[in-house]
Structures are given as C-alpha cells and as structure tokens.
Amino acid sequence: MTLEMSPEQIQESKIYREWGLTDEEYLKIKDEILDGRLPNFTETGMYAVMWSEHCCYKNSKPVLKKFPTTGPQVLMGPGEGAGVVDIGDDLAVVFKAESHNHPSYVEPYEGAATGSGGIIRDIFSMGARPIAILDSLRFGPIDNGKTRHIVDQVTAGIAGYGNCIGIPTVGGEVAFDESYAGNPLVNVMCVGLIEHKHIQKGQAKGVGNSIFYVGAKTGRDGIHGASFASKEFGSGSETQRSAVQVGDPFMEKLLLEACIEVIQNHGDILVGIQDMGAAGLVSSTSEMASKAGSGLRLNLDNVPQRETEMIPYEMMLSESQERMVLCVKKGHEQEIIDLFKKYDLDAVNIGQVTDDGFYTLYHKGEMVAHVPVDSLAEDAPTYYREAKVPERIQKFTDSEKYLPEITDSAVSEIFKKLLAQPTIASKKSIYETYDSRVMTNTVVAPGSDSAVLRVRGTNKALAMTTDCNARYLYLDPEKGGAIAVAEAARNIVASGGKPLAITDCLNFGNPEKPEQFWELTTAADGISRSCLALDTPVISGNVSLYNETNGSAILPTPMIGMVGLIENVKNITTQEFKKAGDLIVLVGQTFDDFSGSELQKMLIGEISGRIDFDLETEKINQDFVLKAITDGLVSSAHDLAEGGLAIALAESAFANGLGVDVKVDITNAQLFSETQGRFILSISPENQATFEKLLTESSVSGEVIGKVTDSGILEMNELSISTDEAVSIYEGALPALMK
C-alpha cells in the first residue's frame, strides 16, 4: 500500500521529481493551474503521469507536426486510439503500433504480452475487429546469456497473448545490435477491419451522460508505468517490477467481444469508448473529456478493485490491463450492465459528464482532486529542445563510401557467414511459436516480404509489414528515415499491394540531449519526405524516448508499420521462385552501397561512411513492379534489403528447394551491396517480351540476370553453394545461437 503525503510534504521532499516532474513543472501546476494551491498527493501523481513524454509527447509534439497525416484515403488520423483508412466497399482498415520497451527489459514475458494486449485494445476501441498482430523487435548481441533470455521470454509473451486471444501474429522483424543490450525494443502493431458506420471516437460529452468502467478489476500493477517509460534506464531500473503490468488474454477476449457487441448492436447509446492504457484511469477519462470540451465527476468508491485499501492515487494511476472506459447516454445504464454481465465482466457507473471543464474525484464522500481537465491533457507542456548535429555525422558525410574487396575464392565463404548473421538468418524458430493462421484469413504467413490477409466478403486482401534499418539512421538520420518508409513500401509492393499509410514507433534516446534530439527531428524529416513521395500519410503512432542505459543510447530506430491494399486476390505475390526455367529479373541498378550494411558490420565490426538514397528512382521502380504484378507478368517478387542481391536470391530459392544460375555485371562485393529501390522478380519466359516492353515504356533500369534451375545449386557469378547447405546455415543459425 502506498502511504500518502500531505501537499506540504510533497513540496518539501520534492518527491514529484521521482515521479518525473521537474521543479518548473511543479511550480506551473501550483502557481498557474491551481492558483497558488499546493497539489495534493493524488493530483501530483496524476500530473506526473499525464505530463510524461509517454502520455503527452511534450518533447516530440513539435516533431510530430512535420508528418503528413491527411489524404483521400484517410478517414481518421492521429489523435484517436488508432488511424483509420478507407479500402472501399464501405470498409476500412484500422491500425496502430505501440512500444513496450522498458517493461520488456524488466519483465520480458509480461512486458511483451501486455504490449500486445494494449495495442489490441486500441484497435477494438475504434470499433474494429482485430485481425492481425505484427512485431518489430530489437535485442543486444545474441551471444549474451541475458539477451537470449530476453529473446526467449519476449517472443513467448507475444505468442502467449496472441495465441490465447485468437488473433494471428503474422509478421514482423528481428534485429540485433550492441546498442540494444541494455534497452531492447518491443514494438507491436495491430491491424483491424471495420465498417464505416461502426467507427468510434474516444470522447466523453453530453452533460449527465454516464462514465462506465468495464473489464478487469484494478490492482496496484503498473503504477507510474508511463513515467517509468519516460526516463533513462539506470542501475536500479531492473528492479522496478511494480511498474510492469500483468496481462490476462482470456479476459481480453471477453472484453473484446463485449465491446464489439456494444458497438455493433447498441451503438446508438454509446457516446465514446477508450482503452485504459498508459496512465490508466486518469489518462483515458481526462483525454475523453478534454477532446469533447467537457468536465468529469468521478466517484472512486465504485471502481472495481482486486486489492484492499487502495487509495485514490493508486486507483487513478494503476495500469492494470484489460480495462476500458465507455461514455453511455443517460438512461441506458442498465443495458450496458446487462450486456457485460453476460460476459461475466464488471460494468460499473463511476461518474458523469459535466460542463464545468473540471476533473473532479470523490472518495468516501470527500473531494480528493479538482483540476482543470485540459491541464491534464491538451494543455500539457510542450518543449522545443535544442538540436545539435553529432560530430560523427559530419565525419560520415565527408568520408568516402566503405568499399570492401572480395576475391573470387572468398565470395562463397563470405556468403555463408552472411547467411548466419543473426539479423539476416531465418527467424523461423521465432515465428513458428506464433499462431499465424487462426481466424483463417491469412494467405501469406511470416517469411515473405509482407503478411497478406484476405478481406472476407470481397475480392480484396491487405498486405502488412514492419521495417527499419537503424544502422542507416545512425549514419544519416534523414536518409535512414526515408529509407525505412521506402523499404516498407517495397515490401508491400512486392506482395502485390498499393501502399496506403503508415504507423510508427519512434524509438530514440534522451531528447534533453541536443544530439539525441537532432536524431529524432532529422529522422522525422526523412520519414516525411518518403511519406509525401509515396503517398503514405502517417495515421497513428507512438513515441518512445529515453531509450538509454547508463547514458548510452540505442541506435535511432523509427519503426515503420505499413498496410497496403491488394485490389484483387489474384495479384497476391510471394517471394519464392515458383519453378525451374523462369527468368530472374533484377529491377534497379546496383552501386557500391556498403556503408551501414550487414557486410560492413560483419567484416570490420563497426559501421561508418556515407549513404546514398534516390527517392525518385525508388518511386519509379515501385510503380513499375506493382504495374507488372497487376498485369499478371510476375511469378515472384522480393525486395532487396540486408545482404543485398545474393541474400535475396537465396531467400527466393529456399522455399521450393530450387537453384539459380545468375550472371550479372557486378563485382563480387556488389553481390552484397545494399543499394535501395531494387527488386528480384521471376517471370515466365512467355511473358518476357511483354515484360521488357513495359520495362522500356516505364524508363526503369532492369535486366534478366539468369534463370531459376532445378539443380539445387545457387550460382551467382563466382559464388557457388548448394541450396541445401545454404538453407541449413540460414535456418540453423538462430537456434544454434539460442542454445
């Protein structure tokens, strides 16, 4: 049980600093918001979590304004639980990504599991039925025992929650780097489908309307979780287990079905709905009121509790999982109670909407908080941080590109070593623990460029992916940010989809350090540039700052989640070569792009040098490939990323045990170059003439570089290895390293 302090003790002890408030912020609350009154224990706690970076984006809000957020396809952009994009036929796709980084280091299983649960609630709070989960994971070197434990438990947590709730985990990515050793990244994306008429908002309006608490009971878990996620890790952070929530996927399944039933069958009495996520009850209710310009009066005696003698501070800040807030029209309370009772869930009226603009709490007959509602939400402070270019950036910009030399005799061995690099090696051992086909909508499961799910009742499908190569951002945040969006779009296009929009998780270091803030704001410039060029507005997202341990920051890692629309299921394309005799086409030119590459990291143990990126060529190449696919000319498609051409060819050959015979006018090293904007396609010989005509008309650089064979040998210039041996290395590397 938490012991309350008096307002005077709070001021004297400055305990608010431990909760994340600065002296200046505390004085602003006291002098400007409360007109000289000292905030009490509950009020101070509420401001501490609501003014955390995790809740109010006080350091990143000016950066987020750079993003393009509108477009004819966007029905709802940032500001609600998730973004909503039209896909025709009166249907929309709803998606968002969230981070659960700090909790997943302290308690990897529960941290990852509750990260999944939270983002799922964001989706069904919009009225959508969740149809897919994706994850983007970053870990330290896998030869470290602590890292292996975190990998094992994080993936088990994601699998455990998704598998139990019955939502397929269909895709994602995993990468390893020293910078994540003390600060892993666990970003989870959820995608849902909805009819336009069921789209909801998180709002509390209409004087006298009732505020309902529904779902699981409140405990003491996760108190100050939002504050915990808004500061650097230090020597004692691993012991902060009370800041980590505990999830129950079976409870969430009941809550999901109950909320969907309310929305679809009782939508006329529902005013608003929102997940109780970060900062729990105070965040959800104050945000709902602030968005509607309302006030709220809540009676905490009615809050369902699973622990005894909880005080208002604990009830308001608890981040217990599987809870939602509903605003219900006055006079219809019993309908809500009866519906949730059917699911054996609490549904309790805890207050009413007012028109006084205040957030007022009562407990045991006494007023325990009375503050302007906007001061908790819309009027939280915003900081314009100093940005300073790190010294390393000028060095990289001025330097020559990294150019390795690889002899004919060495190229095959280097290829084998690349196949076994943890970031490149198959993640099959991870994604096989996920149920990727529950709900029976999954057409393309993990292992291809994008996951693809059919849209029942239509001839359409959705392609979805997550992407980010943080090494590029370390060398050049602007180009790296642009590349992250472009690679996500390449994955969608290679699957036969038209990119629609993105969500993001902006994982960066401490924004109070000018060099770290520069990385954030510069990466946002690059993301915006690609989003505008590729017509993929930012419709939702999350910011996770202070990803530093003992002063050492992670690589800047803005994870991009993207969804695309495949208008006709016949255009669904996968990366694997289909049959011997098909021609292999390389779309895009290959240059000496090794800075930040897997090859550079493997050969010299570090990354350095200048990187290049031609966004105009990227767009032209993507448009061409999508046109070729929709014209029915392409048998398989795979984008080129880490490891370059050689890795892409191998991955395309693996699934069906085929070989390749490739002769291309590039150096041995360029087989592993990571020049952007490239694709590997396979086409049937009878489509060659039509394909090459389209290639010429599109002014795209592309050429037939070889053919698919049934020899079981991968032959690429001087590189030669059996497909079986390559598959064994590729699929065996990660399980061997995890032992």
Swiss-Prot record:
ATP binds at Y57, K96, D504, G541. Gene3D superfamilies: PurM-like C-terminal domain (3.90.650.10), PurM-like, N-terminal domain (3.30.1330.10). Mg(2+) 2 binds at D122, D275. The active site is at H54, H100 (proton acceptor). GO terms for cellular component: cytoplasm. One of its GO terms (molecular function) is magnesium ion binding. It catalyses: N(2)-formyl-N(1)-(5-phospho-beta-D-ribosyl)glycinamide + L-glutamine + ATP + H2O = 2-formamido-N(1)-(5-O-phospho-beta-D-ribosyl)acetamidine + L-glutamate + ADP + phosphate + H(+). Pathway: Purine metabolism; IMP biosynthesis via de novo pathway; 5-amino-1-(5-phospho-D-ribosyl)imidazole from N(2)-formyl-N(1)-(5-phospho-D-ribosyl)glycinamide: step 1/2. Keywords: ATP-binding, Cytoplasm, Ligase, Magnesium, Metal-binding, Nucleotide-binding, Purine biosynthesis. It is found in: Cytoplasm. InterPro entries: PRibForGlyAmidine_synth_PurL (IPR010074), PurL_linker (IPR041609), PurM-like_C_dom (IPR010918), PurM-like_C_sf (IPR036676), PurM-like_N (IPR016188), PurM-like_N_sf (IPR036921). CDD domains: PurL_repeat1, PurL_repeat2. HAMAP family: PurL_2 (MF_00420). Belongs to the FGAMS family. Part of the phosphoribosylformylglycinamidine synthase complex involved in the purines biosynthetic pathway. Catalyzes the ATP-dependent conversion of formylglycinamide ribonucleotide (FGAR) and glutamine to yield formylglycinamidine ribonucleotide (FGAM) and glutamate. The FGAM synthase complex is composed of three subunits. PurQ produces an ammonia molecule by converting glutamine to glutamate. PurL transfers the ammonia molecule to FGAR to form FGAM in an ATP-dependent manner. This is Phosphoribosylformylglycinamidine synthase subunit PurL.
